[in-house]
Regions:
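Short beta-strand to alpha-helix junction loop
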Residues: 60-67, 141-147, 156, 192-214, ...
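Mid-domain catalytic core of redox enzymes
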Residues: 229-342, 346, 354-355, 385
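N-terminal glycine-rich dinucleotide-binding loop that anchors FAD/FMN and/or NAD(P) in oxidoreductases
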Residues: 47-71
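Glycine-rich FAD pyrophosphate-binding loop
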Residues: 25-50
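N-terminal Rossmann-like FAD-binding beta1-loop-alpha1 element of flavoenzymes
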Residues: 6-33, 421
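Mobile amphipathic helical/loop "lid" adjacent to a hydrophobic cofactor/ligand pocket
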Residues: 66-70, 79-180, 195
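Helical element adjacent to the flavin cofactor pocket in flavoenzyme catalytic cores
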Residues: 187-242, 246-250
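Conserved flavin/dinucleotide-binding core of flavoenzymes
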Residues: 314, 318-426
Length: 426
């Protein structure tokens, strides 16, 4: 009597786990993805309110030049919507200025030179860095020795004025680290990607990314609402919270660092642990058109001490995230603020009124997301990638074992799938 081979069991249906499952399925290996939550996506989730707003769990974007994303996604099927490549920056004195990416909008190059952000030398240095990074493979950038981003910027010759008015609000938002303690090799990677990529979101929200991957897998190969309590026998046995025991050809831990540690019965992750960055995303609804006037730019706040770090008028990028006649506003606050949801909302309103005028006082609070482990920290000296293989039949993947990026989550998932395909028999 023929019996089906034991599947590769992947714990976690976030981006890394789904990427791993997709590549294994393409290689003809049976897979079973176990997810504790009620939907796929991990941190990449979109909630729909009763009145029809689509709220991503935290402000998120897709950089279309990510090598792993280009391998993984069918962009045409995602109905992508684009931000303009640049930002509107509110300076310390309250004035606003618009920065355009000159590689995406060459006609704006002279306007960029006239911007009050930075000196002429600062702007020429940006051109110098663009030229230095052009054509270099991302893995080469990430493999370099590193210092903090702040030290790198100063060593490169940029003034404190452009550091405070551009690099802190922009890259501090990317890293969730306004102090710019993140490693400089990751800065070069991110800088290169922003210069070369379109900045996009799926029209119906970021959860369309994991759903596209999950929909490629065979029916029944993703089990939701299925928490795992332990992994045993070096990755050959999986114990579920409902008492069920599953046999596996191998196990892939595609969970965050703390969940991985728990499943391994350890106080810390098996690989070098990373601290996590905290962010809070607060959503507001406004009747009629938002005050951004269709510019589709991310609004950055360079004012020291502000709780509002960046603002996105999300429905100007994709009208589908808000019901007809209303607009959706996303407000991000990074780091620990020590405020209750009510206190935070009130403080944000005060700052938003100061920025956008009295109409902001009328914006209706929809929901607040406090995301404790939004991104792993990535500081100088940290290896570009930790061990993906823990034993002959036990593996781990995710951005926390590499660097804090969707590209890393997808890439480590692919690499684990390749290891299993070559070295693990069913």
């Amino acid at each position: 009597m023929n019996t089906a081979p034991d599947p590769i069991v992947i714990i976690g249906a976030g981006m890394a786990g789904l990427a791993c499952a997709t590549w294994l399925h393409r290689a003809g290996r049976p897979v079973l993805v176990l997810e504790a939550a009620d939907a796929v996506g991990g941190r990449v989730r979109t909630d729909i309110t009763p009145d029809g707003f689509r709220l991503d769990r935290g402000f998120q974007i897709l950089l279309t030049n990510y090598p792993e994303a280009r391998r993984m996604f069918d962009y045409g099927a995602l109905n992508l919507r684009s931000y303009r490549s640049g930002a509107l920056v509110r300076l310390a004195d309250g004035e606003e200025t618009t920065l355009e990416n000159p590689l995406h909008a060459p006609s704006m190059a002279f306007a960029a030179l006239a911007s009050p952000i930075g000196t002429l030398k600062d702007k020429l240095l940006i051109g110098k860095l663009v030229a230095q990074l052009a054509g270099r493979p991302p893995e080469q950038l990430l493999a370099q020795p590193s210092v903090t981003t702040l030290a790198y910027l100063r060593n490169f010759g940029w003034s404190e004025q452009i550091i405070d008015s551009f690099f802190r609000p922009f890259f501090g938002g990317v890293y969730l680290d306004r102090e710019l303690n993140t490693a400089s090799n990751f800065f070069e990677f991110v800088f290169q990607q922003f210069m070369q990529s379109a900045v996009m979101v799926p029209a119906l929200g970021m959860q369309q990314l994991p759903e596209q991957l999950a929909n490629r897998l065979p029916a029944g190969s993703v089990r939701l609402n299925t928490p795992v309590v332990a992994v045993a026998d070096g990755g050959r046995t999986v114990h579920l919270a409902n008492g069920e025991t599953l046999a596996a050809a191998a196990v892939v831990l595609a969970t965050d660092g703390s969940a991985t540690a728990h499943l391994l019965g350890a106080s810390q992750p098996a690989a070098l642990p990373l601290a996590a960055r905290l962010t809070t995303c607060t959503y507001f609804a406004t009747v009629g058109r938002a005050p951004s006037h269709g510019r589709r730019l991310l609004h950055l706040n360079a004012r020291p001490g502000a709780l509002v770090h960046n603002v996105s008028f999300s429905s100007e990028v994709s009208a589908a995230v808000a019901p007809t006649g209303q607009s959706l506003v996303s407000v991000s606050t990074h780091g620990e603020h020590g405020l209750s949801e009510e206190e935070l909302t009130a403080r944000l309103r005060t700052e938003l009124v100061d920025w956008f005028g009295p109409m902001a006082a009328m914006w209706r609070h929809l929901r607040t997301y406090r995301i404790e482990e939004a991104l792993p920290a990535y500081t100088p000296g940290h290896p570009m990638q930790q061990e993906l293989r823990l034993s002959d039949t036990l593996f781990q993947c995710g951005d926390w074992v590499s660097y804090p990026s969707l590209n890393a989550a997808l890439g480590t998932g692919r690499q684990v799938a390749e290891l299993i395909t070559k070295e693990v028999t069913s």
